[in-house]
Each structure stands twice: as C-alpha cells, then as structure tokens.
Amino acid sequence: PPYTITYFPVRGRCEAMRMLLADQDQSWKEEVVTMETWPPLKPSCLFRQLPKFQDGDLTLYQSNAILRHLGRSFGLYGKDQKEAALVDMVNDGVEDLRCKYATLIYTNYEAGKEKYVKELPEHLKPFETLLSQNQGGQAFVVGSQISFADYNLLDLLRIHQVLNPSCLDAFPLLSAYVARLSARPKIKAFLASPEHVNRPINGNGKN
C-alpha cells in the first residue's frame, strides 16, 4: 500500500485517519513505535512528534494536515469552496476539544474529570447546532457527502462516549449521527476489527 502510518500503539490522533482510509477502501501499513524505539527515532521527526504519515514519496507530520491531505485526495472536502471552509471550521472545533480531552487524560484525569464532564455539554453543543443546520441533522456535519471532518468528529464523539457514556443523551442529532456513521459497512468492519478493538485509546491507560 502507498500509505504508512508511523505512530505509538494507541488510537490517539490516528484513529480518525484510519477510519477515513478504511471507509475509502484503502489499505495502509502500520509502523508501530514503542517507548524503546521512540528516542532514537525522535530527532529525525520534523516536529519531534508523531504521527508520521507517508503517501508514496510524500512525508507528512501533523495529524490535521494529514486529514486535510486525505480529504483532498479522496474528495472529502465539501463540494465547493464554501463547504470546504465549513469543513475546516468543524475540524478546528474538533481539534480544540481534542486538545482539552488530551490535557484531561494526560495531566489532570483524577482531579479534573468531574468538572470536565460537567462542562462537556457546552463543548458538544456547537456540533449539535451544526448538524441541525444541515438537512435536519440527517446527513453529515457539512453538506450531503462525508468529509474528513466527519471522521475526526466521529472519533472525538466515540472517545467521549467512553469517558462519559451518557454524554450524548441530551444531543439526539449527535447521538444518531454517531450510530449512523458507525454503521457504514466499512467503518463498522473497522470498528469490529481486532486492530481497532485491541488498540488502547490513550497511551497511559486512562480513558
């Protein structure tokens, strides 16, 4: 396969791109980096971080740049410039919440979880609003075709359902959206695969 994902043995910042590739019927290679192999590899990585993504002779770092590249490659970037701008906006919103989530998981889980869960609805509400403004919430987050931001949002919502199983109860459109996208045949197969199931969400065992 032309694609290689180099990353730690977690879902982390790569599960959205893995779902995208699976749903687009692409195969890819996984180069798994362990705590032993990471220190010698780190100096060669552009920003001294992973994931590293290879598409033939193109090497990319930064998970959102990788998602946008795949969005352009597979026509998952809206149907026109206006939709593309909205897709970017949604993806930036996903990134904001993903950063908050990562801070909780890696720096403040025990002390901060209760407050995080309490404030979560206000962070989820914009996505419910976006769905409600697009075909009554029965389609995708932007327009009538799936975009790279949908895969990123789907992953974000699924990991929050693990953190707080009732987090989408107050958001019927988001709840239905997760069920609908998770039922897409290739995503459903990916989510049932041992690769996904056995890969921890985060690197420290907290989720």
From Swiss-Prot:
One of its GO terms (biological process) is glutathione metabolic process. InterPro entries: Glutathione-S-Trfase_C-like, Glutathione-S-Trfase_C_sf, Glutathione_S-Trfase, Glutathione_S-Trfase_N, GST_C, GST_pi, GST_superfamily, Thioredoxin-like_sf. Residues 1-78 form the GST N-terminal domain. The modification Phosphothreonine is found at T59. The keyword GTP-binding does not apply. Keywords: Acetylation, Cytoplasm, Lipid metabolism, Mitochondrion, Nucleus, Phosphoprotein, Transferase. Glutathione binds at Y7, R13, W38, K42, Q49, L50, Q62, S63. SUPFAM superfamilies: GST C-terminal domain-like, Thioredoxin-like. This is Glutathione S-transferase P. It comes from Sus scrofa. The lineage of its organism: Eukaryota, Metazoa, Chordata, Craniata, Vertebrata. The gene is GSTP1.
